[in-house]
Curated annotation (Swiss-Prot):
Catalytic residues in the record: 47, 124, 148
Gene name linked to the record: HER2
Function: Allows the formation of correctly charged Gln-tRNA(Gln) through the transamidation of misacylated Glu-tRNA(Gln) in the mitochondria. The reaction takes place in the presence of glutamine and ATP through an activated gamma-phospho-Glu-tRNA(Gln).
Stated family: Belongs to the amidase family. GatA subfamily.
GO-annotated biological processes: endoplasmic reticulum organization; glutaminyl-tRNAGln biosynthesis via transamidation; mitochondrial translation
EC numbers, comma separated: 6.3.5.7
Catalytic reaction equation(s): L-glutamyl-tRNA(Gln) + L-glutamine + ATP + H2O = L-glutaminyl-tRNA(Gln) + L-glutamate + ADP + phosphate + H(+)
A family per Pfam: Amidase
Gene3D superfamilies: Amidase signature (AS) domain (3.90.1300.10)
SUPFAM superfamilies reported for this sequence: Amidase signature (AS) enzymes (SSF75304)
Matches recorded under HAMAP family: GatA
SUBUNIT field: Subunit of the heterotrimeric GatFAB amidotransferase (AdT) complex, composed of A, B and F subunits.
Name used for this protein in its record: Glutamyl-tRNA(Gln) amidotransferase subunit A, mitochondrial
Assigned GO CC terms: glutamyl-tRNA(Gln) amidotransferase complex; mitochondrion
Record organism: Eremothecium gossypii (strain ATCC 10895 / CBS 109.51 / FGSC 9923 / NRRL Y-1056) (Yeast)
Length: 463
């Protein structure tokens, strides 16, 4: 109880400095009481695209300013039942679109790991990662579409876990791209991530993409008896764009793992080279469809100051979207138009399937969804970097993105492939390099095996 109250006491000052929360639960301290529940008195931050009855849900967008949901998301209900105390709704890139945490109606989130200068916290779950890094929550929920939990975790030197697609309910999560969106968990250590995941890992009949119980039973059989891991190092995710200093630190970690008996193998997933292209064909197309509902009638609000008498009815509402969201709506609608649908969208779907099949071919476990046969000589996990470099300053990131939005899209190059395949991934801090993460990836549904491996990697870095 004392620790929870201390975190909540520090919250206003941290929020003022780093712009972490869009709204704060003013009664949180009164909710701290003796508890023996699984997450009793653990303080949590909820990303502002996960609906809550008692706090506004805005997606950091002017379109949803002040919106109050009539219900709680399933994950919020589960956390409440487990005894967690909600501190507030965390800042984010508008509707989850961005990798820097700067595209917010409420202003950019700053990185508590770099207090000496204004530095980006990563996106889109910027506020969730910043809340963990600032020490004002024990853990936070984010959403990961193409790296939105893992990238901020790397930039803030915290842990960010994206479960397998379908393991955690999306009911009550405001969609960006529904075939990719996954609720993720951020914390300081893997052990706490595991505790939270155990609470959230269950079938939800309200979510049509929730993994059914029969597949969860198959997933429970994915257990390793051996102590040492076979670790694959994907050649496509360790290229020349990575700074020499980061490569050197990564090699130190690999040497330590090998010294402890883990086996390292070079592997190749050639389809990774198409991942960014595929992602930006599919995700904006889904976003364009999802955001069409914000018409000022069912959802959203109208800008009464605009004289749009000669324009379309919904223009005053659509005008409240930020620049990045507008860019992706335009791109998504183009990819869905008659001329581009066959050449862009459908080809991207085929390339996505090819990527999934190639990932399946290098893992020792089978993919319980695709039915692809396991590779007896395959690896247990993949190890790569989460990002190419430490986080840039706010000024540098903004300047680079202003020159071309494509510059920021490249930040997702190491995280997007796993999202397209629906694989479980986790980013843990790289020892000796503040603001850089190691990314571990396992076969679909092997989430607990992945968490075991992540604990091993973190422990070996301490030795």
């Amino acid at each position: 109880m004392k620790r929870a109250l201390e975190r909540l006491r520090q919250l206003p000052r941290a929020n003022e400095r780093f712009n972490i929360f869009n709204s704060v639960n003013l009664s949180a301290a009164q909710q701290v009481m003796p508890s023996e529940k699984p997450l009793g008195n653990l303080v949590v931050g909820i990303k502002d695209n996960i609906v809550t009855k008692k706090l506004p849900t805005t997606c950091s967008s002017g379109v949803l300013a002040g919106y109050m949901s009539p219900y709680d998301a399933t994950v919020v209900e589960l956390l409440d039942e487990a005894g967690a105390v909600t501190a507030g709704k965390t800042n984010m890139d508008e509707f989850g679109m961005g990798s820097g945490g700067i595209h917010s109606f409420f202003g950019p989130t700053l990185n508590p790991a770099f207090p000496e200068r204004p530095t980006v916290a990563g996106g889109s779950s910027s506020g969730s990662a910043a809340a963990v890094a600032a020490g004002v929550v024990d853990f936070a929920l984010g959403t990961d579409t193409g790296g939105s939990v893992r990238m901020p975790a790397a930039y803030t030197s915290t842990v960010g876990f994206k479960p397998s697609y379908g393991r955690v309910s999306r009911h009550g999560v405001i969609a960006y791209a529904q075939s990719l969106d996954t609720v993720g968990i951020g914390a300081r250590d893997v052990g706490l991530v595991r505790r939270v995941f155990e609470v959230l890992d269950r079938h939800d009949p309200k979510d049509p993409t929730s993994l059914p119980d029969e597949l969860r039973q198959q997933a429970a059989a994915l257990r390793r008896e051996k102590k040492h891991l076979k670790i694959g190092i994907p050649a496509e995710l360790l290229h020349g764009s990575v700074a020499a200093e980061i490569r050197e630190r990564l090699l130190v970690v690999l040497d330590k793992l090998q010294a402890q008996g883990h086996e390292l193998y070079p592997v190749s997933v050639p389809a990774v080279k198409n991942s960014l292209l595929v992602y930006y064909m599919l995700a904006p197309a889904e976003a364009a469809s999802n955001l069409a509902r914000y018409d000022g009638i069912r959802y959203g609000c109208r800008d009464e100051d605009l004289d749009m008498s000669d324009e379309v009815l919904f223009a005053p509402t659509r005008g409240k979207f930020g620049k990045e969201v507008k860019n992706r709506i335009v791109l998504g609608n183009y990819n869905l138009c008659s001329g581009a649908f066959k050449n862009n969208y459908m080809k991207a779907q085929k390339l996505r399937v090819e990527l999934i099949n190639q990932f399946d071919s290098i893992f020792a476990f089978e993919n319980i969804c695709t039915g692809n046969k396991p590779n007896p000589a395959g690896v247990d996990v993949l190890l790569s970097l989460t990002c190419m470099a430490p986080p840039p300053s706010l000024e540098a990131f903004t300047s680079k993105e202003n020159k071309s939005p494509v510059n920021s899209y490249i930040n997702d190059v190491f995280t997007v492939p796993m999202s397209l395949a629906g694989l479980p991934c986790i980013s843990v801090p790289l020892a000796g390099m503040k603001g850089v993460g190691i990314q571990l990836t396992a076969q679909f549904a092997d989430d607990y095996g992945l968490l075991d491996a992540a604990e091993d990697v973190m422990q070996e870095q301490l030795n």
